[in-house]
């Protein structure tokens, strides 16, 4: 008869093996294949692909899009989390469900929504055309689509933190004469800064890797409205495999750097993060 400790050891080993095998097979192996394929013709060929004018345009557009969408979503996430966590009002459950909407709606549908609203034949198309404003097939449309698919990340990180924090500290600060901004800066922000940082990092990684929604609203204009994921598709369809994998490798490296930064911050400030959660 097996002892309970034997069963637990076997179960633990089996679960670890399954997890490691799954991660290795479906995550690490494809990632390694991407890097090896990018360097198949040497590092000079990979760098040449990254220096191509269309690749440079895609890189710049991706970074600009993330630089605009992420701060705006951070502001929205703070406001939405504050409203949901601190106040009770009619429609609160509906607002919470709407915050999660991008998790359940296909990014392609999100892109089509913006085309129907802002496209030349859309609801606002004639007005935009008369005022010489271009949203679809231009940077504004790409930013809007990216914001749609990424806006839940910051809010979802902050809502539980703000709910646990309560309102006592803010009310005490206001009673002592602090303004709303001072209360947020000195009381609320220190308690949510790690959740805010994690949400921003996840939002940034998702923004740079977004494909579906951006593909619909960008028009796929090579050298103008192609982001890095779209440029990878174009290169791959043109049988330029080394160039495609080179750009994909850069995109993967950006995501890896984001994860490494998150892990380093967790390790460096582990005690402070634990203290915030205990509080």
What are these regions (language model features)?
Residues 2-5, 43-51, 56, 91-92, ...:
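Membrane-interfacial helix termini and adjacent extracytoplasmic/periplasmic loops
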Residues 7, 14-18, 26, 33, ...:
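C-terminal transmembrane helix and the adjacent membrane-cytosol boundary/short C-terminal tail
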Residues 2-8, 46-49, 68-100, 112, ...:
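Transmembrane-helix boundary motif in ABC transporter permease subunits
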Residues 25, 60, 64-76, 80, ...:
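Hydrophobic alpha-helical transmembrane segments of multipass integral membrane proteins
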Residues 2-13, 34-71, 86-87, 234-242:
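Periplasmic/extracellular loop-to-transmembrane helix junction in inner-membrane transport proteins
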Residues 28-32, 36, 75-80, 109-112, ...:
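Membrane-embedded alpha-helices of multi-pass transport/permease systems
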Residues 9, 46-48, 53, 208-264:
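Interhelical loop and adjacent transmembrane-helix boundary motif
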Residues 17-22, 71, 97, 101, ...:
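Transmembrane alpha-helices
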